[in-house]
């Protein structure tokens, strides 16, 4: 067990070295590794977020609350009013929307099945295991934030799927996340509240 943890930490360090860390400096890289370790150890989290999904010809904006416990995520839409109360339950690779017994399906935003209801689980998975391409400390509104860009190291920058996460540098809470496909932002999450255990 100890040997696998050591190998995992070494691989993350090599990933940052190979990716250059994006000019964020050693402090940003070390903070990114610390935050990754915390998210790997996290048992559960709760969040309030605004999710914007861009399908190209139409854009949808949802407000939701999320409770993630292990491999299960329970998401409840709180706005717009027409869908408030709609619940999404995601367990491992399966997900469905339900409301008073009715099940609703949403369309994919990107190859691989990314949908608005899978946004928060996808962002959390990236926080835990995404390839760290760029790590930069910057101001995000009034918050000192760590911006981490994750992408497939085999793809050119701006092609394929790229995920950008912003963490509060002091609390390590996730404050924002974006998923882009071939250089176009298809999904954005703004967190007004995020707690983890």
What residue spans do the PLM features occupy?
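Gly/Pro-enriched, hydrophobic low-complexity segments
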Residues: 133-197
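Positively charged n-region of N-terminal signal peptides that target proteins for export
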Residues: 1-5
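One face of beta-strands
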Residues: 45-51, 58-77, 86, 95, ...
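Short, exposed beta-strand/loop patches in secreted or surface proteins that constitute
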Residues: 38, 64-68, 88-89, 133-141, ...
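Hydrophobic lipid-interacting interfaces of membrane-associated proteins
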Residues: 52-54, 80-82, 102, 182-184
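N-terminal leader/targeting segments and the immediate start of mature chains
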Residues: 12-67, 195-197
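Flexible, processing/modification-adjacent segments and terminal tails
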Residues: 49-51, 97-156
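An acidic-aromatic
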Residues: 65-119
């Amino acid at each position: 067990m100890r040997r696998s943890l050591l190998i995992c930490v070494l691989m993350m360090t090599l990933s940052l070295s190979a990716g250059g860390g994006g000019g964020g400096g050693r402090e940003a890289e070390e903070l990114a590794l610390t935050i990754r370790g915390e998210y790997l150890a996290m048992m559960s989290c709760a969040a309030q977020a605004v999710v914007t999904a861009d399908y190209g010809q139409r854009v949808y904006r949802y407000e939701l609350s999320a409770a993630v416990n292990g491999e299960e995520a329970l998401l409840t839409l709180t706005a717009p009013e027409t869908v408030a109360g709609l619940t999404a339950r995601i367990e491992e690779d399966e997900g469905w929307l339900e409301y008073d017994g009715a099940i609703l399906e949403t369309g994919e935003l990107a190859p691989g099945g990314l949908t608005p209801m899978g946004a928060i689980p996808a962002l959390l998975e990236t926080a835990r295991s995404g390839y760290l391409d760029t790590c930069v400390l910057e101001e995000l509104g009034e918050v000192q934030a760590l911006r981490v860009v994750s992408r497939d190291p085999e793809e050119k920058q701006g092609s394929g799927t790229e995920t950008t996460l912003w963490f509060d540098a002091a609390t390590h809470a996730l404050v924002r996340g974006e998923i882009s496909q071939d250089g176009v932002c298809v999904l954005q999450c703004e967190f007004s509240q995020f707690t983890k255990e």
